[in-house]
Amino acid sequence: MADLKTNLLGFTMNSPIIGASGTVGYGVEYEELADFSKIGGISGKGLTLHGQYGNKGERLWETPSGLINSIGLQNPGVQHFIDVELGEMLELKQKYGTVAIANLGGHSEEEYVEGAAMLSESGVDIVELNISCPNVKVGGMAYGVKAEAAGEVVRMLSLIHI
C-alpha cells in the first residue's frame, strides 16, 4: 500500500484523511468501526466557549439523497471538552497517531479568543475555526459571510500560539 503520510501545520499525519467535525463525534464512538491507523486526524464536534443546547424542534430530516440537519452547535462547551472528550481524542492519538483537532465556533470575537486561548493550553493539536456554520443564528453566520469579519477573527486568533 502507498505511504499516504502527510504534514499539516507541522504534524505528521498517517494520511490526508480527517474525520470531519460533526460526523465522527470525538472519534472514540467509531474506534471499533474504522481502522484509525489510516486516518490522519479527527476534528471533534463543534464547540463554543459556553455549552449550548442547540436548536429546538426537528433537527434532522431524511431525504432520498441523505440528511439535512439543523443541530445548532449543541455542545458541552470548551472547558467540558478539555476535561472529558479531549482525553479520549488524545488516547486515540497515542494509539493510532491521529491528530486531535478542536472545532471552535463563537458568537463574538471575544468568545473566539477566550475559547482558543483555553484550547491552546489544553494539549489539542490544532484549532479549526468554525466561522460558517449556518445553524448559528447569532454571530457565527456573519463571520463566514463577510470576508472582513472572517479576517478579523483569524487576525485576532493568529496572535495566540496554538
Predicted features and spans:
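N-terminal capping/small domains of soluble enzymes
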Residues: 1-100, 106-107
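Catalytic cores of alpha/beta
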Residues: 30, 112-118
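Structural recognition of alpha->loop->beta junctions
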Residues: 38, 118-127
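Non-cysteine beta-strand/loop elements that form the S-adenosyl-L-methionine
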Residues: 43-50, 124-133
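Non-membrane alpha-helical structural segments and their capping/turn regions in soluble enzymes
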Residues: 75-79, 109, 113, 144-151
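Active-site-adjacent beta->alpha loops and helix N-cap segments on the catalytic face
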Residues: 82, 135-156
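Short beta-strands and strand-loop turn motifs
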Residues: 97-103, 129-135
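Conserved small/polar residues in nucleotide/adenosyl-binding loops
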Residues: 160-162
